A protein has these predicted regions:
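Ubiquitin-like/PB1-type beta-grasp interaction modules and other compact soluble beta-rich domains
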Residues: 1-74
């Protein structure tokens, strides 16, 4: 059992995920902290509260963006 997804433009197979899996499971598999990322699933931004109910299926397209602090102080 595995799940193949297009993640940030690259096709990746996740051997530990099966179909269907939740977006929450993928975020855990990637070891990402949910408070500093945004996720787009098949062209739609997914609010964090909906990650556990968002079902991933074979071939889904995801974009995961990390927020980074920075800048200068004047």
């Amino acid at each position: 059992m595995s799940l193949t997804l297009v993640l940030n433009g690259q096709t990746r197979t996740f051997a530990t995920l099966s179909q269907p899996s939740s977006l929450d499971c993928l975020i855990a598999e990637l070891a990402l902290k949910g408070d500093r990322i945004a996720v787009e699933h098949n062209g739609e931004i997914v609010p964090r509260a909906e990650w556990p109910q968002t079902t991933l299926t074979e071939g889904d397209r995801l974009e995961v963006v990390h927020f980074v602090g920075g800048g200068t102080l004047f």
